[in-house]
Curated annotation (Swiss-Prot):
Mg(2+) 1 binds at residue 128. It catalyses: (2E,6E)-farnesyl diphosphate + H2O = trichobrasilenol + diphosphate; (2E,6E)-farnesyl diphosphate = alpha-humulene + diphosphate; (2E,6E)-farnesyl diphosphate = (-)-(E)-beta-caryophyllene + diphosphate; (2E,6E)-farnesyl diphosphate = (E)-2-epi-beta-caryophyllene + diphosphate. InterPro entries: Isoprenoid_synthase_dom_sf, Terpene_cyclase-like_2. Terpene cyclase that is able to convert FPP into a mixture of sesquiterpene hydrocarbons and alcohols. The main product is trichobrasilenol. Additionally, side products include alpha-humulene, caryophyllene, 2-epi-caryophyllene, african-3-ene, african-1-ene, isoafricanol and pristinol. Does not accept GPP, GGPP, and GFPP as substrates. Pathway: Sesquiterpene biosynthesis. A motif (WxxxxxRY motif) lies at residues 360-367. One of its GO terms (molecular function) is alpha-humulene synthase activity. Its EC number is 4.2.3.-, 4.2.3.104, 4.2.3.137, 4.2.3.157. It comes from the Eukaryota. The keyword Lyase applies. A motif (D(D/E)XX(D/E) motif) lies at residues 128-132. It comes from Hypocrea atroviridis. This is Terpene cyclase 6. GO terms for biological process: isoprenoid biosynthetic process.
């Protein structure tokens, strides 16, 4: 498929229909500010066909780790021991299959490393959903601050200079489960990579705390401010560092801090955010989580939802091009091929952050039903409230 244009996006409105059986959604809308209600009204019941996002990143293939099913057996046993509500565990296991996500992020890692990598992804989705729209802490500012403080303490305990892997008595389940996960990850990381992971996790946790505050405000944020906030705190950056754990190597810090590598990490982060804003739009819209670029461009620039999605797709193409161009500026060695291989592996890990998130979304029902995909992997987004 070629690059999408406005006309190549199949878009159609459907008639406004009665929301019988969706009284919860109606009640949710009634409590929102006028600005938020207006965005819902304008997007409600639209159906938009979105092109296969993987085709917008053609140089980056998707691969699958061969032991996903075997690791899932181990995950199912591990989940029984996790102090999280059974309903939440069942929901995430059925819809998310985060072992699949780990298997796409790290397709060439050894099977024994897959367990900790999969457990980390289960943790990040469990933890994030507590604070995200519809979670236990969505409206609880003090509870969110406390949860983030406990989580930051866990990160310091496990990844700091004097590691302590014992959770404090009374820790919430999503903090308690993180201690052994970080213990296992640290065992396979160099000191410099451990310090990077520590800072990246702090940035993520503090960013989620900031996002929760933004969602409580009456006015929707500017889309560019929202995009920058997501770049600053997005939880995918720790998954790049974990590629060093997965593939048994350490990237020297001077290479990680090289401007071209920083650019690649930044652009792959932006790509992951952009594609996720599109692929998660339906799910977020249905629970009135309106801090989504597709809806924020609508609000700020008086665009239709179709125009807004097209704009996000255009940004995705732009950032992909910037990322490709940055590879030519990397500090390749003329004598150390092992170092060059490690650089290549790190770059592939960055790229798989974007392609892996999209590929996983097309192979589970975290954000939409698989029946909404056609044979060309085009997605028919359904912005109804049912």
């Amino acid at each position: 498929m070629g690059q999408p244009t406005t006309t190549s996006l199949f878009m159609r409105d459907v008639m406004f229909h009665r929301m019988t059986g969706t009284s919860q959604a109606v009640n949710d809308v009634a409590t929102l500010s006028g600005e938020r209600r207006e965005i819902i009204r304008r997007a409600l019941n639209k159906k938009i066909l979105v092109p296969n996002i993987l085709e917008l990143m053609p140089a980056w293939p998707s691969e699958f780790q061969p032991n996903i099913d075997e690791v899932n057996v181990e995950i199912d046993e591990w989940l029984k021991t996790v102090n999280v509500a059974k309903e939440k565990k069942l929901k995430h296991r059925a819809r998310g299959n985060y072992t699949l996500l780990a298997g796409i992020y790290y397709p060439h890692c050894r099977k024994e490393k897959m367990l900790a990598l999969s457990q980390f992804l289960y943790w990040i989705f469990f933890w994030d959903d507590e604070i995200d729209t519809g979670g236990e802490l969505t409206e609880d500012r003090e509870g969110t601050i406390l949860c983030c403080a406990e989580t930051n303490k866990c990160i310091n305990d496990c990844l700091g200079p004097e590691p302590n892997y014992t959770p404090p008595p009374g820790s919430r389940g999503t903090v308690e489960m993180l201690y052994p996960i970080l213990r296992d990850l640290r065992a396979g990381l160099s000191p410099v990579s451990t310090m990077r992971l520590k800072q990246e996790l702090h940035d993520y946790v503090n960013g989620v705390k900031n996002q929760q505050k933004v969602r409580q405000e009456d006015h929707l944020p500017n889309p560019w401010d929202h995009f920058q906030m997501r770049v600053d705190d997005v939880g995918v950056i720790p998954s790049i560092t974990q590629n060093e754990y997965a593939m048994d190597f350490t990237l020297p810090d001077w290479i990680r801090r090289h401007e071209a590598m920083e650019e690649i990490v930044l652009q792959c982060t932006k790509l992951t955010i952009l594609l996720n804003e599109i692929l998660s739009l339906q799910k977020e819209f249905r629970v009135s989580q309106l801090e989504n670029l597709c809806l924020l461009f609508m609000n700020t620039y008086d665009m239709s939802i179709e125009q807004s999605i097209h704009k996000v797709l255009g940004l995705l193409k732009d950032h992909y091009k910037i990322c490709i161009e940055a590879e030519a500026r990397l500090p390749w060695s003329t004598t150390d091929e092992k170092l060059n291989n490690n650089i290549r592996e790190y770059i592939r890990g960055c790229q798989r952050l974007a392609t892996g998130t999209a590929c996983w979304s097309y192979n589970c029902e975290r954000y939409f039903k698989l029946s909404q995909l056609n044979d060309q992997q085009e997605l028919l987004l359904d912005l109804s409230r049912t």
